[in-house]
């Protein structure tokens, strides 16, 4: 086989590797963030107290559900 064909095969393999790696990393991060959200109810409660709001359970659940729904749409 000629050198040109080998170069073409290497370039195609590299592009496929980059594309596959990108999608695998993206899927891994989405799953990781679903299992370990960057903010939880206790953090939300603390933020609301610091802002001078009384954190009711209903309000906390509404905010957490809104965040989960927002993340799922991306």
From Swiss-Prot:
Localization terms from the record: Cell membrane
Keyword Cell membrane annotated: yes
Transmembrane segments: 5-25
Membrane topology: Single-pass membrane protein
Keywords for this protein: Cell membrane, Membrane, Transmembrane, Transmembrane helix
Family: Belongs to the UPF0154 family.
Protein name per its UniProtKB record: UPF0154 protein LSL_0542
Organism of derivation: Ligilactobacillus salivarius (strain UCC118) (Lactobacillus salivarius)
Organismal lineage: Bacteria, Bacillati, Bacillota, Bacilli, Lactobacillales
């Amino acid at each position: 086989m000629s050198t040109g064909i080998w170069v073409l095969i290497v370039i195609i393999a590299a592009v496929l590797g980059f594309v596959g790696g990108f999608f695998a990393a993206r899927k891994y991060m989405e799953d990781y963030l679903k299992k370990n959200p960057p903010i939880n109810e206790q953090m939300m409660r603390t933020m609301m107290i610091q802002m001078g709001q009384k954190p009711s359970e209903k309000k906390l659940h509404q905010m957490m559900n809104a965040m989960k729904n927002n993340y799922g749409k991306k």
